[in-house]
Amino acid sequence: MSNKLYQVLFVCTGNACRSPMAQGILEHLLPEDYRSKVKVTSAGTAAIENSPASSQAIAVAKEHGIDISKHRAQELSESLLRNSNIVFVMAKEHYQYIAQHYPQYRDNVFLLKSFDRKPNRRRHTDVPDPIGRPQGFYRRVFQELENEIRRILPRLLQLVDTNS
């Protein structure tokens, strides 16, 4: 039995909206007995180090009882990818960035909306970036993230169990 934490990484562009909300949602939804087994982090392909999450993302998360106010952005790095068991990206551009800059890790990288799903050419696979958009758009993105994380959670917990 391994004592190593199962590490989940969410990646977006600025690490200010989508990935911090996704991180907060997964941490919130993790069953109590998994919280000591799983470490959830987030990063951005073009993040400004130590920037807070956007005020709209913080407000929308708070509406759902999730506090991401202490979040500080970090740039995606080789060490973050190396230490992650699984990486969920918000859009194809993030997958392509990792495939180009860190090809050795691409087998652990998945589009959040495509993970554990049969391919469907009509399904939109990107989670839209809410930066600069109205609060209602942030709410829709939050709901989309929550729906996707609820959908993948059973499979993710299986992966954690397999790893321990």
Describe the residue ranges of each PLM region.
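Conserved active-site segments centered on acidic
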Residues: 2-83, 154-164
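Hydrophobic structural packing positions in well-ordered secondary structure
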Residues: 12, 61, 88-89, 145
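Short, charged low-complexity intrinsically disordered segments located at boundaries
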Residues: 52-59, 89-92, 111
